[in-house]
Amino acid sequence: MDVVKRRAVKNLVAKLTSVSEQTRTEALCELRLLSKNDAESRPLIAEADAVPLIAESLYSPAVILQENATATLLNLSISSKEHLMSSHGVLDALSHALRHPASPFVAQCAAATIFSLLSLESFRPIIGHKRDIIFGLVEIVRNQGSAARSIKDALRALFGVALYPLNRAQMVELGAVQALFSLVVKDGRVGLIEDATAVIAQVAGCEESWEVFKKALGIEVLMDLLDNATGSSYRVKENAVSSLLNSIQVGGEEVASDVRGRMEARVVDGILDVAENGSEKGKSKALALLKVLEAQDSRFEALTSHSS
C-alpha cells in the first residue's frame, strides 16, 4: 500500500511542474484533499519534494491555486514542519500570501501555517527574523476589513512570534502595539479581544513597548478592561494584569511609579477580582501586581495573609 501511495504522490507532484495551469490546479486540488484526509500521505508528499513547488503557487494570481496551495501547506505543517522550514522559499512565499492574498481564505491559511510552524521553539527566531511576515500579520490585524478567522489566526501567529523575547522589539517597531490596541477598542467579536490581549501581554515584556503603550493610550485601555463595569472576561482581565506586571518587571520603578499615578479604585477592584476569582496563574500575577503597586486595601491584605 505504501508503494502505491508513494507512486500516486510522485505522479501528482510531477504534474506541479506542468506548463498547463489546469494540470497544476488539478494536481494541487488532489494533494490538498490527500493531505487533509490521509495523515499517512503528508510525509510522503513532503519527501517527494513537493513543498517548493506548492510554495511557488502562492505567487500565482489565480485564486484557486493560492487557496489550494496554502491549504496544502497548512495540512503538511501538521506533521512535516521540518520539511517546510528547510524547503527553499517557503517562508517568503507565505509572507507574500499574507501581504497579497487572492482571498481571505488564503490569508487565513498562511497565518495558520505560520502559527503551526511556530509551535516548534527552534523556529521562532527564524520566523521572527522575517520582517515581512510580522508586517503581514500586523496588517491583517490592523485592517478592519479582515475576516474574523484571518484575524484570529494572525493573532495566534503573533503570539507565537512574541514567545521568543528577541522578536518583541521588532513587533513594536512594525506597529503591532497600535494595531492590537485598536482592535481591542474597536472590535467586539468574541475571542478576538482575548487573543489580542494575550499578545499585548507578551509584547509588554520588552523595554521598547512602554512608551508606545502610552502613545497608543494602551495603559488607559488596559485599566478600562480591568474595570468590572466593562464586563471583560477573566481571561481578558488576566491578560491585562500580565501586561501591566510584565511592563513593570521590565521597566522597573519608573514604570511602576507611572502606573501607580494612573491607578484608580475601579482598577484596583478589578485586579482584586482576578486575585480572588481568576485562574491560579492569574491569581498569582494579580497579587504580584498589587504588591508592586503598593495597593492599600483590606481585601488585598486578607489575600496576602492567606497566601502566606
Question: Model regions: which residues?
Answer:
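Eukaryote-specific detector of the first structured module of a protein
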Residues: 3, 7-83
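Eukaryotic N-terminal low-complexity, Ser/Thr- and Lys/Arg-rich leader segments
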Residues: 1-4, 308
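Structural recognition of alpha-solenoid helical scaffolds
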Residues: 4, 8, 40, 49-53, ...
